[in-house]
């Protein structure tokens, strides 16, 4: 591996793949982590037809494809499809040969150990990379915000987790993870629309609902008040969304009922604590001396934290939980959708990080289990 080789940073989210070159300030390409396969055989003989499509191409042809996400709740469930996504990332999107660049991958905390071993194996054996590293997503988000102490609340498409970090040290005993995130909200929104007579059932229609959710949903400062307002003055809350076939759909109280599940998961029938309680429990598992600094540095990251009012609502909920004299500060950086990737870009271009890479020689000596020794 030459000194000049720029590292590739690939943030494999459950919903989106963010990838680019180390040292850049934003990911070069962002595409959905989807693999689509045609539902029907092709009869137009002259037309070139692939057996599968990846990313944006799958998204554009979604009407004739069955779409599958290879990553569910942050864990890779289909390795063949995952390889296709990585292949697409390196050769079609970034247009680089992976055998010439070290690769930094990201992972959710508390993932099964076999998941990162298999990632390591595929990188070295299939893509022949000279070196690689696997980093925890939340730690990278903290790097991106320019802090060394804080509690990161990362919520993406598949996993939400809270990770307290003090002076650069992760406190693994205090990490909390809930397998409820953006995708669960999308599924629930589909159910609500079905109750109102709009059927969204296919995998392609699920993507339409995801778009409605991203464009129209917001978080209510006071859920009960907002419900009352939506019943009395529904016109203030309703928004019109145009479906791809030209039909119009009115989205009313779903706009705030859907993301409310982040704070009250029982709304969608989940038995896990809300985001604010998860963060509070994480802080309470930490040493009493550092709690004050953690309350003061609650950093949001991930696409599911992009809803309007989320920072204010989280501040309000945390203030109710914390001791009354405690100052609560929630930091919601505008680029938080990509902060994991940005942190990876910063980390992999540091000169001090260069000895951290798992090299090909080390992999050949020790096998995939080296990833547990070299990466946190």
Swiss-Prot record:
- Record has Hydrolase as a keyword: yes
Listed A to Z, the keywords are: ATP-binding, Cytoplasm, Cytoskeleton, Hydrolase, Methylation, Nucleotide-binding
| Species, as recorded | Plasmodium falciparum (isolate NF54)
Q: What's its catalytic activity?
A: ATP + H2O = ADP + phosphate + H(+)
Give an example GO cellular component term for this record: actin filament
Question: InterPro entries from the entry?
Answer: Actin, Actin/actin-like_CS, Actin_CS, ATPase_NBD
Q: How does it assemble?
A: Monomer (G-actin). Oligomer (F-actin). Polymerization of globular actin (G-actin) leads to a structural filament (F-actin) in the form of a two-stranded helix. Unlike for mammalian monomeric actin, monomeric actin is able to induce oligomerization with ATP or ADP. Mg(2+), which is used to coordinate ATP, is required for polymerization.
Localization recorded for this chain is: Cytoplasm; Cytoplasm, Cytoskeleton
Give the EC number(s) listed in the UniProt record: 3.6.4.-
* Role played: Actin is a highly conserved protein that polymerizes to produce filaments that form cross-linked networks in the cytoplasm. Polymerizes into longer and more stable actin filaments compared to ACT1/actin-1. Has ATPase activity. ATP hydrolysis leads to the formation of a stable intermediate ADP-inorganic phosphate (Pi) actin, which is followed by the release of Pi. ATP hydrolysis affects filament stability; ADP-bound actin depolymerizes much faster than ATP- or ADP-Pi-bound actin.
What's a Pfam family this protein contains? Actin
User: Which top class of enzyme applies to this chain?
Assistant: hydrolase
Per the record, residues carrying Tele-methylhistidine are 73
**What controls how active this protein is?**
ATP hydrolysis occurs in the polymeric state. Unlike for mammalian actin, ATP hydrolysis also occurs in the monomeric form and the release of inorganic phosphate (Pi) is more efficient.
Q: Which residues bind ATP?
A: 14-16, 18, 157-159, 213, 303
Q: What is this protein called?
A: Actin-2
Give the family per the record. Belongs to the actin family.
Q: What else is known?
A: ACT1 and ACT2 differ in their polymerization, filament stability and helical structure. Unlike mammalian actin, Apicomplexa actins do not form long and stable filaments.
